[in-house]
Every structure is written in structure tokens, then in C-alpha cells.
Amino acid sequence: MSVSALRLIRVRRLSTSGPAVKRALPWRDIRRIAKVTGAIVFGGCVFITYEVVTLNQALTIDTSAILQEKQKSYIYPTHSTNREQESLASGLTIKTRRELHKAARKFLEITSRVLHHPLDEHLSHLDADPHECALWVLLKRSRSADRAVRHLAVQELAHNHHWRDYQYQTAAQVVDQRTAVALARIPNVDLRFFLPPPPLPHTEDDISIEDGLRQLLASLPQSDVDQCVQYFTSLALRESSQSLASQRGGLWCFGGNGLPYAQSLTSTPSEKVETFCLQALVQHSKVRSHCEHIVANGGLQLLQRVYQLRRDSPKIQRNIVRIIGNLALNENLHTTIVQSGWMSVLAEMIQSPHIMQASHAARALANLDRDAVRQKYQDGVYILHPQCRTNQPIKADVLFVHGLLGAAFKTWRQKDCDVTDDEKLEGVREDYTECWPKSWLAADCPNLRILSVEYDTHLSDWNSKCPVENQRKSLAFRSQELLRKLKDAGVGERPVIWVAHSMGGLLVKKMLLDAAKDPDLSSLIKNTKGILFYSVPHHGTFMAEYSVSVRYLLFPSIEVKELCRDSPALRDLNENFLNIAKDREFKVLSFAETVPTYIGPMLKILVVPAHSADLGIGDLIQVDVDHLNICKPEKKDTFLYKRTLQFIQDALGGRRIK
């Protein structure tokens, strides 16, 4: 082959050469790559998910275990007992626990420094989150020797609602007795600040509450006590579930509260027996020496059992808290009361929407709060306002005194009225108040201290709660008893306005006459500025003339006998009081009823006529209501309440008390 021919062949090869053709991958290789990639992605997801779940389990607290320990010894977290595996997840778990333990140790070190060193020593180098530091600083200040600093710290503690749950639980264990009582008297305080009652001790042989109350009563001293205490104790020990007859009252309601046993107790016999026993314990708790016996014999724990069992019985709960309030009059028992778990109970009850419940708790807490309250509130003296700690200065006292068969709360309720079904659906009575001095007067005059007193009265010795000591029912005895209680409450240290209904007005006059003769009570007379009378029988009543028609007056009590028309005792009382009232220039306003009152079947009388309600000085205003409703305004904007409010403001100097 020639040279030219070879060149031609090479040129043709070069001209026909093009880009290299790619070789197509077979489907077998594609499936293999997909399997490997999918396995890697799926395995990675499974691994990450496993790590997240493992870490979450390691950091999650067993809340059920915490709640169980909280009931036994309050707040003690349990330790985890899971086995640790030799794996990456186990390593993360161990590392997390170590970090948590370090944080816990650091937290305890900070706590120790805060509680055991002055504030200025640790604030400069305290290593903690701001909210953690703030809590412990306030807890430290709540124990300050400076009273003003303590009170301010308690207010800041209660008003800061950003604390976390564990901080409330920690504070509940750290706060001292004084701070716990103070927190309970702050309005709307968070109840997590208070430890729950400790577990109650197991009773021997599964003893019932009824038997426990009987044993407690039997263990109390029966000698050197007045006859009423002996009577109530013997009555409670004698009655049993089988022999206790159901007590019912009639329609008679002279002072606004019905007969003592007209209030239904429920049909449960055991509950009725418990009520009798609690009434006897109330009488014993009025005796100072018996209070220590009640506590020493396990009374606080037994009352806690009854309280928890009878949460559906407001009357039983009020009697229990009434006993606690009487025990709290003894300062040496305060520590035992607090340690028995009553702070959480009282803090919850004082926030009750029911005024009677809240007022009983307010009295008990005030008697426990020796850091802010100097006065003591004896049995039967209730604080309607202010029931909590307040920064507002109190300028005057207003005292409400009920009448025959009245009560500290129900006498002063809003007027009852018939409500139609349509009105119920519209909710027109949602604003109904159980005690208008608490709901209305306190709102219009927040700088007043409003008190209401209570004492037992009876129309007939047939219905007397304690028929063995008639001298206790006279005006003279009640006057001395109430004067002593009011002095303990600090009444007379500032201007005083008296508001009385029916026989309560006679009692007020007797108290002022007795105070005028006692040098220790001279401030009460000096500071009395005005008296408001609601249908007070200054010159007696016609009630005794109906003894034939009304069976309750067949054997009238001392109270009824003292109300007889043209009674010499009433005449002397009125004349002597008029002399003092004119000399002291008391402001006086009297309301008189004009509508007859139903006091029994087919019996309707004008209980206190206008001429008997006329004291002889001051204004007399006749109102178209009956004897029961003369002290119960229908609404806040009615004449009866507006005129009452105006009188109180005018008697205190013509300025609005705000």
C-alpha cells in the first residue's frame, strides 16, 4: 500500500470519530444503590429518634412519685433506679444526670447562703437566675427583724404570680410560722404557698368520728366549769344516733334568723350527733384551761378528720373553725395549730364566696396573726371588714348588734324577695348578698372596721340552748360580757358608730351606761359618735300580751320579760341613757316599722309601734316594712341603705370615709 493510501485511510478515521458514547447503567445497579441509600437514611432516622426518646425519658420527672412523697413528707423527689447500659444513649443519660446533680448541689449552696447570711453578704456574688434569687431574697426579708420590711416582703411574695410550681412548693416548706399566717391573710394569695395537712394518724380499732368526739369530750375537765358547759357536754354524751330526735322549728322569726334548730342539719343521724358534740366543744374552747386539754388529747387532728369528712356541711365546718378561732386566742398554741395543717384550711376558707365561711376563717387568722393584729377577737365577735391585711388606715369602727333570735350575719342580709322563674333565668339575683355591711358598706367606706357581734337569745325557756342559767340571758349580764369582748377587740380606741336592731338597741344602751360607770371603758363613751336604731322597743312591745296565742310565750324567757310594755326597767334604762346621750351629744337616727309582721299561723302584729321606736331624741323615720325587714335593704340604691350610709358618714364628721 502506498504512502498516499495510508494517509487517506487516517484522514477518514479522523473525520468519522465523534464523542464517546455513554454506557447505560443496568436496572440491577440502580436498585442496589437505592437499597443502600434507603438503609442509610432509615437507619439514621431510627437512631436519631431513639436518642431523642432516651434523652426525654432521662429528663422526665415521675410526677406520680412526687405527689405520693408530697403527701407523706411533703416534697421529696424519688431517685431513678433504671439500669445504665453501655451504649451511647446510656452515656447521654449519665451525663445529663450528673449535670442535674451539679445544678441541685449548686442550688442548695445558694439556699444555704441566702438563709444563713445577711443580704448584703451574698447579693454581690450570688450565682443564680434572677427569678430564683428574687424568691429567696423575699423569703429572707420575710424573717427580718424590721416589722415594715417583713410586711412588705410578704406582700411582694403574695402579689408576684410568676413563681413556678416547684418554687411555691419550696417556699411552703421554708416559710416560718409568722410568714405562713401573714400570707394566708393576703387577699387572693396562691394556695400553693401552704403545706397540705399532714397524714392523720390511724385510729385504734377503726374508731368512728362520733366515738372520737365523745372520747374527747369525756377527757375534758368537768369540774370548775359553768353550768352551760356541763349541760352541753352531758347532752352530747347522752345523745346517740338512735335516740336523737329530729329538731324542727316553726315560722317564728322575731330577730331575722328563725329558731335555733329551724336550720336543718340533714337527715344523717351521725351528722346530728357530731353537731351536738361540736357545740359542746365550742363551749369548752371558751375556757382557756380547757384549750390545752383539747390540743393535748388530739383535738386538732380529730377536728381535721371531721372537717375533711364533712366538706359538704358548711354548718359543721363553721363550728370547727369557730373552735380553732377560740384556740387561737391562746398564743402558746399557735405553733401546734400551724403544724397541724390548719393554715391551708383557713387560707382556703377565707377566700370562700360565702361570707359566713370567710368571716369565721378571718377571725381565726386574725387571732393567729400577732405580727400585724394587736387585738383579739373573742367568741361571737366577727370581722366583716377588713378581713385581710390592708395598708389603708382604719379611721373608725362600726358595730352591728342583732336583736332577739337574730344572728351576726343573717340579721343583716339583703331583703328576701320572691323571684319568678323568668327572673331566675335572667340572673337578677346574682348580686344578692348574705350580709350587706360586708358587701355594700365596706365598698363605700373601705377605711372603716366593721364588726358584728353574736349572742344567744330565746323567746321561751322551752327552746333555750342552755336552760340552766337564766341570769346569763339578762341585759345586765350580756352587757358586761360583750363589753369585755369588745375591749379585747380594741373597740373604743377610735370613733365608734353603733347599729342595732330590735333588742340589740336596748343592749347597746345598757353597754354605754355600764361603760360610763367604768373608768377602764371611758374611751368607749368618749369615742361613741352615733347610734342607729332599727325598730328598737325603747318603751316595750305588745308581744307578751299574745302569750295565749303563741306557744313560745307560754313560758317567756328573761329577754321577753324585759321587753314588756311600760316595764320599769325599760323606763329607767331609757331615762338614764337619754341623760348621757344629751350630755355627750350622740347623733341618733331611728327607723320604725309600719307593716305588721307574721309571727305565727293566723297571727300578725306590729311588733314595735312607732311610738315605742321613738327614743325621744334624734330623727325618727317610718318605713313601709315589717319588723324583720326593717334592717334588710332591698337594694343598694334604696332609701333605707342610702340613709344609713349618710348617717354613718355624717356622724363621723360629715366626710366621706374612703
From Swiss-Prot:
UniProt record similarity statement: Belongs to the SERAC1 family.
One Pfam family here: ZER1-like_2nd
Transmembrane feature ranges: 33-53
Membrane association type: Single-pass membrane protein
One GO CC annotation: endoplasmic reticulum
Superkingdom classification of source: Eukaryota
UniProt entry tagged with the keyword DNA-binding: no
Source species: Danio rerio (Zebrafish)
Purpose of the protein: Plays an important role in the phosphatidylglycerol remodeling that is essential for both mitochondrial function and intracellular cholesterol trafficking. May catalyze the remodeling of phosphatidylglycerol and be involved in the transacylation-acylation reaction to produce phosphatidylglycerol-36:1. May be involved in bis(monoacylglycerol)phosphate biosynthetic pathway.
Keywords, sorted A to Z: Endoplasmic reticulum, Lipid biosynthesis, Lipid metabolism, Membrane, Mitochondrion, Phospholipid biosynthesis, Phospholipid metabolism, Transmembrane, Transmembrane helix
Biological process (GO), any one: phospholipid biosynthetic process
Gene3D superfamilies: alpha/beta hydrolase, Leucine-rich Repeat Variant
Compartment annotation: Membrane; Endoplasmic reticulum; Mitochondrion
Gene designation: serac1
Record's protein name: Protein SERAC1
